[in-house]
Amino acid sequence: MNMEEIVALSVKHNVSDLHLCSAWPARWRIRGLMEAAPFDAPDVEELLREWLDDDQRAILLENGQVDFAVSLAENQRLRGSAFAQRQGISLALRLLLSHCPQLEQLGAPPVLPELLKSENGLILVTGATGSGKSTTLAAMVGYLNQHADAHILTLEDPVEYLYASQRCLIQQREIGLHCMTFASGLRAALREDPDVILLGELRDSETIRLALTAAETGHLVLATLHTRGAAQAVERLVDSFPAQEKDPVRNQLAGSLRAVLSQKLEVDKQEGRVALFELLINTPAVGNLIREGKTHQLPHVIQTGQQVGMITFQQSYQQRVGEGRL
């Protein structure tokens, strides 16, 4: 089977990830579980010669790994990681949706579209690796593209979903190809007249600082963070800075944060997997807790904040049970 046929078969079986190496049988991940795939692994070296450019091949040789994205036929796009291991080069491939998903299809909290109307501020999407953060960000961009007149600038590593400008002008920049780092791309973005800035990941204190500055100066910033809950996301941002800077960062965050959407995936009774969400909205009470460093109280605020649209993972779980999904 060629790669297009493999991907078509994977889509048919709701595969999320493919693992390929010429030294052992192909495997794929379905509903979170790794299984043997019903096809022989293609020649990984040949695939990489086709998919990687000269710079990416040089990175793979020098660092032993490289991240990339590639488009195949039928508008199918893959996010890939090629890495050297004892038995040769391996490929881990994540299948991306061939279309921009709708927030309603993901079961996102109903208040999220209203939050996306904010003219400035920071909205975080958090969760473990493989929890669907990129898909949710893509749905947010898709919503804005249909409902807002704005300039959206994305900084991604690599570019995953490809957007066609509709009501919005959308420009996508890839780290390592169009700019060197998230921080340098974000610094440049402040001079490029965006209304919305999408950051693939908040990786370091410099990027976090610039993101907060952008959020304070009239931009809506959408970004991801690897944490398992909303309260942990706030703590992670603050803890990225030395002790003497924590209080100023708390003040910035208390003023500029709009919401933290955390998510995780569970096996769906019907098909594939279903997302569970936790949503923290920055109300005046939440802002005060952030400012005072009392993030341990945030879970209680979320639990009692349903009237403004907040939701806990447990409440989200009960909704999915009621829908017959879990």
Task: Name the predicted role of every residue range.
Residues 1-326:
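Short, flexible helix-loop junctions that flank or precede catalytic/ligand sites
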